[in-house]
């Protein structure tokens, strides 16, 4: 029980309605369900599940080693704890686009994005990527569109072609992807304002901007992206990077000093954690569950 009010069809309707507004949607990545709850509490528009983050969390590099089961199971666990729509990175489609779309739709996801790299893919902000043909990607998109049952389930086409074939060829690909049924385009690894402006000028669909750190793209304020005409901005790896840096620093401090007294102020308190997991609400099941005070646990 997660005390969630909205069922998946309503989340998809919400996502569709948000896209039709004139406001850009701000969408951080969640690497676990608890992070998704925090994203909703703070007031963001949706939750994103990154394929790279899923791979990293399993101890793998982002080179296509995760399976449909790996990503769909984690995505389901994330999406079921929030009233927000969830967008999932499905990499290159996990061999069967039909099975992949059916799985993610059944698991309550609102949108997925599919990329045009070869199966042994890599992070979109690395060099020497290899692409499948435009025709092959078009067929994948068509298979995705045909497989979905809910008209509000969104197919997002990601193109990694800019750094391989140039921005003009990437735009040509994206136009073909739109014609194939993609409602949103994700032009990966754009460099600067000129790139973002050019893509917006040439494409008439909804556009997604990727503001990942340590990559090829300039990091814009969301208001700048909104002015450039973009509809969604994702922060795919941000929460994992924040968490892992803090965990590493804390573990090193404990190892060096033999105690955690120096880093208590960097930790989430017991009281705050219990607020985030709705501990008190579980008294609706049994009044003995939350029969204590968190005073002094700040």
What name fits each language-model region?
Residues 2-235, 242-252, 289-297:
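Alpha/beta enzyme core
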Residues 235-298:
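Conserved alpha/beta catalytic core and glycan-binding cleft of carbohydrate-active enzymes
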